[in-house]
Swiss-Prot record:
Cofactor (UniProt): Mg(2+)
Protein name: CCA-adding enzyme
GO molecular function: ATP binding; CCA tRNA nucleotidyltransferase activity; magnesium ion binding; tRNA binding
Function noted in UniProt: Catalyzes the addition and repair of the essential 3'-terminal CCA sequence in tRNAs without using a nucleic acid template. Adds these three nucleotides in the order of C, C, and A to the tRNA nucleotide-73, using CTP and ATP as substrates and producing inorganic pyrophosphate. tRNA 3'-terminal CCA addition is required both for tRNA processing and repair. Also involved in tRNA surveillance by mediating tandem CCA addition to generate a CCACCA at the 3' terminus of unstable tRNAs. While stable tRNAs receive only 3'-terminal CCA, unstable tRNAs are marked with CCACCA and rapidly degraded.
Quaternary state and interactors: Homodimer.
Gene symbol of the encoding locus: cca
Miscellaneous note of the record: A single active site specifically recognizes both ATP and CTP and is responsible for their addition.
Amino acid sequence: MKLTTFAPEFAEALPILEQIEAAGFEAYFVGGSVRDNLLGLPIHDVDIATSAYPAEIKQIFKRTVDTGIQHGTVMILDHGNGYEVTTFRTETGYQDFRRPDSVTFVRSLEEDLKRRDFTINALAMRADGEIIDLFDGIADLKAHKIRAVGVADERFHEDALRMMRAVRFESQLGFSVTETTQAAIEKHAALLEKIAIERIHVEFMKLMQGIERQNGLRTFIDTGLYRYCPDLADQLLALERLTALPTEQLHDESAVWLVVTYLLGQTPAQAGRFLKHWKSANDVIDAVKAGLVLLPKLLTATADQWDLYQAGQAVLVISLQIAQMVTTATIPTADWLERYDRLQIKQKADLAINGQILMQNGFQPGPILGKALAILERKVVLDELPNTTEALLKAAK
């Protein structure tokens, strides 16, 4: 197969390939960018593989940065954008089931592609658009299949995170893992315990945010991968409920964790501990905990202005999305958003009075002043007082 037109990302990087080839070496676009181009999807990162060793690349180009030279990767800065170029390599020994114990630079593209995870990611493209497909990756693209390169057992022993990548690609691309590859995942699922939680987190989040979330979740469950993720080992029923939800795509990380923790039946405190185990960011944890307070009130239509105010707009939006997913009842989303918009204040700083003004009018600093401000804040939110300095001062006195 030969492409006659190039995506802009490839066109911009072509001078890199041409300069390497002019020096007598091979160079190709490789990996996910080639796959996504063939699928008509947006290209995010352009990866280049070459037969030139790092020292040779640094002789060819004037401006380079050693971003991962021990693994053969050099960033080239000569043509505006930074492009990472990696020498063809083989890898041996995977004591931690994630990183190779040793890397050997080679001159063979085939040897380099053999070590890649899936056939759809083991594609290379020449500067003239010719696609190099040594493992039937194009056929698998057309069949919407995710198949390990070579022996699946070996690929997952080399890097156990690849098992999570498989189910993530199912979700992102709407593909299906082949029977042989799925059997290997089931066989080696326990190796996932060797992988850093942060890396599992990234893949799980991409799985949950994909266009075919149910596909990825189904394999995630059927292979037993879930048993080796933080606090999910005994949560099969909740995960099954997750697969049964409507297919609406989730874009926000907080929305993902809100629906997960809600279906797990967690309290805000339990969710906080759960998400700490998953190494989630503090702002995500805070949003999920707030969502777990608001969500049941949206489902029962019992939320008042104070509930909406405490949650804030961002939490309200994700809570409404999840509410629509977890119930067959109609959720009046527009009405809830309108009620939020009508709030006199959206945050404490919007209050027409503050501690300084109160002290100027006879209040002493201390707990009483803080309590007075809290009472005024609540009364304004609940429309029991107008948000004017005059009215609030009068009420405070």
